UniProtKB/Swiss-Prot annotation:
Alphabetical list of InterPro entries matching this protein: Peroxin-3
Alphabetically ordered keywords of this record: Membrane, Peroxisome, Peroxisome biogenesis, Transmembrane, Transmembrane helix
Protein name, entry field: Peroxisomal membrane protein PEX3
Residues spanning the membrane: 155-171
Job of this protein: Peroxisomal membrane protein required for peroxisome biosynthesis. Shared component of both the peroxisomal docking complex and the peroxisomal translocation complex. The two types of peroxisomal matrix targeting signals, PTS1 and PTS2, are first recognized in the cytosol by their receptors PEX5 and PEX7, respectively, which then carry the cargo to the peroxisomal membrane. The peroxisomal targeting signal (PTS) receptor-cargo complexes interact with peroxisomal membrane protein (PMP) components of the docking complex.
Chain positions covered by the region annotation Disordered: 113-135
Deletion consequences: Leads to a peroxisomal-deficient phenotype and mislocalization in the cytosol of peroxisomal matrix proteins. Affects the assembly of the peroxisomal translocation complex and impairs the interaction between the peroxisomal docking complex and the peroxisomal translocation complex.
Cell compartments where the protein resides: Peroxisome membrane
Record-stated family: Belongs to the peroxin-3 family.
Inducing factors: Expression is induced in the presence of oleic acid or methanol.
GO cellular component: peroxisomal membrane
Coiled coil: none
Amino acid sequence: MLEYTAGLIRRNKKKFLISSGIIGVGYYVTKTINNKIQEFQNRIREENFAKEQIKRRFHQTQSDCYMTFLSLLPVLCEPIMDDLPVETITKQLQIRRLEKQIGNKDVKNSGSTVLSDDFSTSQEGAISEDTNKPPELKSKNQLWQELKIKAITRFLTLIYCESLLIVFLHLQLNILSRKSYLETAIRLASETQGIDLVDQESNGDFSGNTQDENLSEQAFLSFSWWLLNKGWLEIKNKIEPCVEQHFGGINPRQQLKINEFAELLNKCQNCIDLKVLNLTEDDIHLGVGVIEDQSQPVGRKSTNFITNALLPPKEFEFFLLQQTNDLDFLSRFNNNIVNTESLNMLLDELNNYLNNADINLIVNKLATLGITKVLDEIVLNLLQKNRPNPISDMNIRDIDLNDFPPYKLAALLANITKQSISLTNNSVENPILADLNNLPELNDLSASVYSNFDP
């Protein structure tokens, strides 16, 4: 049996060798292919996981932007409300009406009745006046003129300042979130693949040993202080002349249809867009704007108005940090020059985004959306008083505003004042603010900033 087997092997030795070689090669090829498939599957899983992580972080960052905006809203609105004290003027007009009624009950209040009950109730819960200061002795006509201008100026100032704050925070937080994610991803790659980060660290890109990253990032976030304390006033001073131009000659007793009032607001907005955003009507319709020179000189001085309203001049940057941080922070920040360099890099990137024409267009879209939503609310409020059946904002677009009766400007001002107060409400459920935050163009801007991994 053994001799037979040995003979069989000798006779078929070549065939056995070829078969063994084929089997060995087949096994090796199969194993190699399986390994490659496994590596490919692992790489796909890692890429999908990375994409999910990026998406999750992106959505979390957008949520953080909105919550930060809501937390800063009272700080933004308080000085605007104080500087444009519509409620104080209303109180003075109410006092004048009471004095006239008490002085002569038989005289009809033909002029004083312009101050409607709607205007009185719209002030409930608003900022109270300073009772220690006696009211200025102004005529009733002067008070009405002042009330008219300040009510509309306050409304438009709130809309534009809130729009700018939303854009500013989305730029800030997406820049920081992208930077944090990129550094984390590269550090993980260095641990798993042995990438040397010494060169990057020496250049200040990854600063675990040379600086506390939180210092430059905290300093960067402090720059919203400029709009909250200085920039809003510049914006208000641009808006008020536009309101004077288009509403100054209208008597509060004059009756206007809703679409006429909306057209006046639209003219004001066009004037503001030209002065604040450097946008004409044609620019807005075409979706283009003036592009600033991206190579800014030392000090980041810009001819773009909103950039100057959002960021301080170079010489005021340390003053800003002093206003927003304690001495311990300032001492630690100044101890390392890398902190200043890192902050300057962040500010330069932010400045470049702000000088992009797309930013002005996005601010315009936010302001337009806010004004439209407020007008919708005014229409609903007026409809509810005239119709027994409730009307939702879902079918408001089906209503022909030309069918509306005219209203006294005073009544429309009362509604504007009421809606202005609602714009100061920093509740998560505030529908107008939520709509502003969900503007598609704003989300596109955030995505472009977050995904910009160019050095």
